[in-house]
A protein has these predicted regions:
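Active-site beta3 strand of CheY-like receiver
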Residues: 56-62
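Two-component/phosphorelay signaling modules centered on CheY-like receiver
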Residues: 8, 15, 23-41, 51, ...
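Receiver (REC) domain active-site loop signature in two-component systems and cognate sites
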Residues: 67, 79
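C-terminal output helix
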Residues: 118-127, 131, 135
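Non-catalytic signal-transmission and effector/linker regions of two-component phosphorelay proteins
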Residues: 1-17, 147-150, 154, 158-160
Length: 160
């Protein structure tokens, strides 16, 4: 179960899960992400990615599509259908760029696409944008929960 942070809790370094069965691609993406203030975690296939996500939901997932054991489409669908992880943004990083592939990715729940070969500036721009959106969304959720609690306390005080 996800633990809610308090409104005033200090922001922690975001975690980016990079999933690719090709070691060179994995290392390249991790090297590019050194320019972003984040911690990277690597997975070599979809099943390994799901095990990592189950232990600790990342703030962002960079997900290859064509992998053994479980495709990126399947991983994406599982992550997005789980209430504990449905808000984790996913960027599919793929050589597949036909309209049908993009449509399938959207149907599986992906938030964005980057085509291979990856352009470093494009990757960094999209990653930073997704992390910022995730940070602001999480902060908004904490603030709303905090305000809801204050409202409950106010209502209880009025009824006393």
């Amino acid at each position: 179960m996800k633990q809610k942070k308090s409104v005033k809790e200090e922001d922690k370094t975001p975690v980016v899960l990079v999933v690719d069965d090709n070691q060179e691609n994995l290392e390249l993406l991790q090297a590019y992400l050194e320019d972003v203030d984040c911690e990277t975690v690597a997975a070599h296939d979809g099943l390994e990615a799901l095990r990592i996500i189950e232990r600790r939901a990342p703030d962002l997932i960079l997900l290859d599509v064509m992998m053994p054991k479980m495709s990126g489409f399947e991983v994406c669908k599982k992550v997005k259908n789980d209430p504990q992880t449905s808000d984790v943004p996913i960027i599919m990083v793929t050589a597949l760029n036909e309209f049908g592939d993009i449509e399938r990715g959207i149907d599986s729940g992906t938030d964005d696409f980057i085509s291979k070969p990856v352009n470093k500036l494009e990757l960094l721009t999209r990653v930073k944008t997704m992390l910022k959106l995730k940070h602001l969304t999480d902060k908004l959720e904490r603030t709303l929960a905090y305000l809801s609690e204050i409202e409950k306390q106010t209502q209880m005080a009025k009824s006393d």
